[in-house]
């Protein structure tokens, strides 16, 4: 195996024995093989488009799901990748039968082995290092593109589940993956393709924003309890709002309280979700703390989308996966039929007594923020608000992430902190007060709600008649996995400069690629909170 797609990759270089995330070598090889098979499907789709042959939308949906399944902390069950690999080949063959062009040797001629051991052996020779390329910088950009495409695939899949999709997004997934096996592009062409990845991710996030707000309403500022009520309980982690909605419907009147964990916290702001009286509050913090937090939870646990870690024996019997999530030995529930989860919750003790642990606020997505835009603009003009910080991104276990806690704590009282994604859990419960009734800490949502932050920035730039880079706004970002890569590429596509990124820089970027980002976008690693605040504010 070789994998270096996440921020915590071993020694900052790459995992080659077992994933820091817990991914076993066989699963890593199967994921690589799936990506290889998908590249062959992508080559067929690109050839079909060139001949005017329509690629079914269903193929795009499958492609997004399959790529998403290889994202960090999604699926650790080797058996789940076998049908995905075979389906990629079947769909490729179906397209190939409709076109005149002879597809190239390689991914488009791949024949899967007949058993699991054979597939693992094939995956061994079709990994990241086996993609044809002799130029280290172009290889770096190819890998960056693959990881960005995984991020797009995650958002496209979520949006499609709620009925929002754009064939152009799927077409880019094909275009990008097919390109990774070409050798005729120079460095400039690869930079352009990577930036196009950011452009398409913006569209994918727009679709997901439309999907979530169309189904559940625009988020509104909402107070969320951090404590619990006495009684039976189910904890929902991940990102999938549809799964949560179905669970809320199926548990209504059953005496079970529903709690969010991790990136599900912003769900409390959606009107069509918060209306359920048994949707009580938020439990725990970010994904990397689940071993301790899940072990102490006295009810059933449902994992939607990514962020699962190896379950401890103490709760393996009470954790359930759904959608693309998989862990060997954990019960997987399909098609929103959460009866087994509910039965388990009813059989478990639940919380013995009420406990008040304070509250936090969420729901400050673009509609909520723009509804008070006039007040915000007036406060800036009056000197009451000096600066905005977007302190956002992924959380993780690697040392150095306390930087973000300290940065927010030390941000001056005349500044506003916008946040989103699970990086917020480094400071989400800090009491920062307000400026003229505007809370100084505004939780804008999940990682995909970077779309909200971008829309707010663009609107503020319009109000002040300046560019986004001229706003009193600084982005201090943390990253962990591939959705964060896609979001970073979106910001670069938009020309956003002076981004601070941490806790460490991606291992897949060569020094020359990093130098390009510094020279053209002034992207920089975080240093210390004091030094960075001084550099930003003077």
UniProtKB/Swiss-Prot annotation:
GO biological process: response to hydrogen peroxide
Domain of life: Bacteria
Cofactor binding comment, as recorded: Binds 1 [4Fe-4S] cluster.
One GO CC term, this protein: cytoplasm
InterPro entries: HCP/CODH, Hydroxylam_reduct, Prismane-like_a/b-sand, Prismane-like_sf, Prismane_a-bundle
Function: Catalyzes the reduction of hydroxylamine to form NH(3) and H(2)O.
Protein name, as recorded: Hydroxylamine reductase
